[in-house]
Amino acid sequence: MAKKSKQMRAALEKIDSTKAYSVEEAVALAQETNFAKFDATVEVSYNLNIDVKKADQQIRGAMVLPNGTGKTQRVLVFARGAKAEEAKAAGADFVGEDELVDKINGGWLDFDVVVATPDMMAIVGRLGRVLGPRNLMPNPKTGTVTMDVAKAVEESKGGKITYRADKAGNVQAIIGKVSFEAEKLVENFKAFNDAIQKAKPATAKGVYITNLSITTTQGPGIKVDPNSL
């Protein structure tokens, strides 16, 4: 623990906590101050000036990052018949029906994305208490409740991310790995920022993005100037 604290202090010394960096500077600093011994994940965090208690100010969606996330996603699909075969052909890791519900209720959670055809939502609904808190419940808004299961699987495997504002208006998203070229992280960051800007509620007032930062798995947070995006 002492070693980690020393590494964190060294990382913090390289950052001006009073400054909001340009996206390019922030990405470079995130890579420079990362001290994890593994290929750490790079994540961005937004605080938005929205009131999520209002139905028209709830932000939720999905997008495919231009350079992927660097993470291998394990995709589970609830489907039957031809759609089940379609999901398997597209590369789904797990495909099934009731037997998967029982397995998940038994504590199995070795997957990252859940996709379902609309007709399967009646049985998937039984998993609400398990999948809901983990943000894994299939939803039409994120493209995970669909008849086009092949597309959903391929997008999930190809760098699709989902995002949702919490009760305080915070949104987090993975934009890649520390090992990515800086230009690719910047491109992913800008693409995600575009999605956040497009999702701005028409009824939102004042400054939309009140705080923005970038961090790695074990690294310090670095403030980012939203205007640089």
Swiss-Prot record:
Gene3D superfamilies according to UniProt: 3.30.190.20, 3.40.50.790
The keyword rRNA-binding is assigned to this record: yes
CDD domains reported in the protein's UniProt record: Ribosomal_L1
Gene Ontology CC terms, in alphabetical order: large ribosomal subunit
Signal peptide: none
One MF annotation (Gene Ontology) recorded for this entry: tRNA binding
Highest taxon listed in the record's lineage: Bacteria
Record carries keyword Hydrolase: no
Keyword set, alphabetical order: Repressor, Ribonucleoprotein, Ribosomal protein, RNA-binding, rRNA-binding, Translation regulation, tRNA-binding
Pfam family, one: Ribosomal_L1
InterPro entries the record matches: Ribosom_uL1_bac-type, Ribosomal_uL1, Ribosomal_uL1-like, Ribosomal_uL1/biogenesis, Ribosomal_uL1_3-a/b-sand, Ribosomal_uL1_CS
Any one GO BP annotation for this protein: regulation of translation
Subunit structure: Part of the 50S ribosomal subunit.
Summary of the function given for this chain in its UniProt record: Binds directly to 23S rRNA. The L1 stalk is quite mobile in the ribosome, and is involved in E site tRNA release. Protein L1 is also a translational repressor protein, it controls the translation of the L11 operon by binding to its mRNA.
Family membership: Belongs to the universal ribosomal protein uL1 family.
NCBIfam families given in the database record: rplA_bact
Listed name of the protein: Large ribosomal subunit protein uL1
Organism: Streptococcus thermophilus (strain ATCC BAA-250 / LMG 18311)
Gene (UniProt): rplA
